[in-house]
Curated annotation (Swiss-Prot):
Coiled coil: none
NCBIfam families per the UniProt record, alphabetical: AmmeMemoSam_B, PRK00782.1
Protein name: MEMO1 family protein PYRAB05390
Gene3D superfamilies for this protein: LigB-like
InterPro entries xrefs: MEMO1_fam
UniProt record similarity statement: Belongs to the MEMO1 family.
Organism name: Pyrococcus abyssi (strain GE5 / Orsay)
């Protein structure tokens, strides 16, 4: 089974332009590490011109800490297709940088242990939130001279129970199979403005990005504290438009079980820095969790 790119040439460029963009994002890449303390990372999934640099901070940290055998990548299901909790079963994902192998053994074990997920490829066919993460991983893996596999999981249902079940299933599956795993939660934060039908506050154009950040930081602080319940409470209280809380929650649960002790916000920005539009402002954050 092969999954071909759905958004190459749209969310990110193809060919040499993609390589040049990645090289620019990673121009400050440090030495390859081998401490393997990172358990999970959070990265955005907008077009690279908006959020690519922020996403690169997560993968820079992973490169400098050491790459795992497998990345379990959670992304929200924007298309509504397929199973509400869909684990891609087997085969390869293709990007302009080449093929990425699915860790099918781990995928099946996660489905078995979670009791709520399905093996399903349809949910992934046109979804961009996981696809856009792969060129970053391919780039750092090539630099490191290492192979890796992935388990892509899309979420159409996102709540505490789903996060708890999936985070625990990833941990138990990795333990059972002896896998070294990092969880990646693909998410953007607040989607503000008339374009999204979400205007919980108003202000001058130059004030709005900071106001978006203030609201996002209420959630980010909960993430940095590994506070799953508190994160979802903040989201409900604000009716917040973060699109991937379920994956972030799974990363929190997995990291707790891996005895993670610290989390760090590496970078934050908004789409306003590029677009200068107040009709649609989206927050982006890079976060890593470490044991």
């Amino acid at each position: 089974m092969i999954r071909y790119p759905a958004v190459a040439g749209q969310f990110y460029p193809e060919g040499e332009t993609l390589v040049e963009m990645l090289e620019e994002f990673f121009r400050d890449l440090g030495e390859q590490g081998n401490s393997r303390k990172i358990t999970a990372g959070v990265a955005p999934h907008a077009g690279y011109v908006f959020s690519g640099y922020t996403a690169s901070r997560t993968y820079k940290a992973i490169y400098e800490d050491g790459l795992p055998e497998t990345f379990v990548i959670f992304g929200p299901n924007h298309t509504g297709l397929g199973s509400p909790i869909a684990v891609y079963p087997e085969g390869d994902w293709v990007t302009p940088l080449g093929k990425v192998k699915i860790d099918s053994e781990l995928a099946k074990e996660i489905v078995k242990l979670s009791k709520i997920a399905d093996l399903d490829d349809l949910a992934h066919k046109y979804e961009h939130s996981i696809e856009v993460q792969l060129p970053f991983i391919q780039y750092i893996a090539e630099k490191a001279g290492t192979d890796f596999r992935i388990v892509p999981i899309t979420l159409g249902i996102q709540d505490e129970d789903v996060s708890e079940a999936l985070g625990r299933a990833v941990f138990e599956a990795a333990e059972a199979l002896g896998r070294d795993v990092i969880v990646i939660a693909s998410t953007d934060f607040m989607h503000y403005g008339s374009f999204y039908g979400y205007v919980p506050f108003r202000g001058r154009a130059n004030e709005l990005p900071n106001m978006v950040k203030e609201w996002d930081m209420r959630i980010i602080r909960r993430i940095l504290d590994f506070d799953l319940k508190g994160m979802f409470e903040e989201i409900r209280e604000m009716d917040h438009t973060m699109c991937g809380p379920g994956g972030v929650g799974a990363g929190i649960v997995y990291s707790r079980l891996m005895n993670a002790r610290e989390a760090e916000l590496l970078h934050y920005t908004t789409s306003f820095e590029v677009s200068r539009s107040t009709d649609a402002i989206v927050g982006y954050a890079s976060i890593v969790m470490r044991r």
